[in-house]
Amino acid sequence: MKASVSLLLLSAASMASAAMSVSQCAQMCLSNMKAKAGELGCSAGDDKCLCSQANYGYGIRDCTTEACPDDDAIAVLSSALSSCPSDSAAVTATGAGGSSSGSGSGSDSGSGSGSGSGSGSGSGSGSGSSSGSGSGSGSGSGSGSGSNSGSGSASSTATGTATGTATGTATGTATGTATGSENSTTGGAGAGAGAGASSTGTNASGTGATTSGANPSNTGATTTDTTLTTTTTSSENGSSTGNSSSETGAGSGSSTATGSGSGSGAGSASTTAPNSSSTGNVAPRGAVVGSGAVGALALAALIIL
């Protein structure tokens, strides 16, 4: 108990001597820093906690240096921290160790340097797309062209329509039967072989036709052949080609549109046999013109007559 009292007395005496060794201006700095105990995270009057705060020592030193130019800031600091352990943060940070009769110097310099670099890169690409179609109706040749240029982003549609006239050769075999019938002007019914009719096809000469009439001799009779029509139908194919269209876009963009057209056209060919009249002898009623080679010879004889 007595020992505790003795320690307290010694501590109080030490504080009193420290207070007496500094000027009134320096004492004001010490009081202000003790009043800031709450800001330093310490309770009021907790000197042990204050000694553990480096900012407590910095505050005393800086305040004395600026507010009390006639006082030795290092001496004031060493006196104020003389009750703190030598390894406390307030002492070691400020270099305030040693006896009160000594002088200590401490310097605090801080330099901050910062460098930063920023780089920005941007890349952009332009794409161009184009589609082209060429359609051909009928068959023939035509051209469809489309072009487009763009910068950055290019988008377009090139449409080429290829139309043309079918140019082709219609080939085929005409199959048809040419038959001719003729009526007598005298009222007698008669049928001729269709002499003078021209057509292309099988049985074009009317071979095998049967003639009969009321006027067997048919002398001076005028016969009229009906129109003989043979229709030949063939299909022809042509092609239509559309020119390619191209498109180039600055940035990056390219496209190719190709137009092509194809079609088919139907062509028909017809032949018409002209009307013909013949005067001469016609086979008697009931006579039948022979078929095959004999019929052809008989027909030729009639034409000559």
UniProtKB/Swiss-Prot annotation:
Disulfides per UniProt: 25-68, 29-63, 42-49, 51-84
Record membrane topology: Lipid-anchor; GPI-anchor
UniProt keyword annotations, A-Z: Cell membrane, Cell wall, Disulfide bond, Glycoprotein, GPI-anchor, Heme, Iron, Lipoprotein, Membrane, Metal-binding, Phosphoprotein, Secreted, Signal
Recorded phenotype for the gene knockout or disruption: Increases susceptibility towards the chitin/beta-glucan-microfibril destabilizing compounds Congo red and calcofluor white.
Subcellular localization: Secreted, Cell wall; Cell membrane
Sugar-bearing residue positions: 183, 203, 237, 243, 275
Gly residues bias spans: 95-149
Annotated lipid attachment (GPI-like-anchor amidated serine): 276
GO cellular component: extracellular region; fungal-type cell wall; plasma membrane; side of membrane
Family matches, as PROSITE patterns: CFEM
The UniProt record lists the keyword Ion transport: no
Sequence ranges of Low complexity compositional bias: 150-186, 196-259, 267-287
Reported function: GPI-anchored cell wall protein involved in stabilizing the cell wall. Not implicated in virulence, heme uptake and biofilm formation.
Domain notes: The CFEM domain is involved in heme-binding and contains 8 cysteines and is found in proteins from several pathogenic fungi, including both human and plant pathogens. The CFEM domain adopts a novel helical-basket fold that consists of six alpha-helices, and is uniquely stabilized by four disulfide bonds formed by its 8 signature cysteines.
Name of the protein this chain belongs to: GPI-anchored hemophore cfmA
Organism: Aspergillus fumigatus (strain ATCC MYA-4609 / CBS 101355 / FGSC A1100 / Af293) (Neosartorya fumigata)
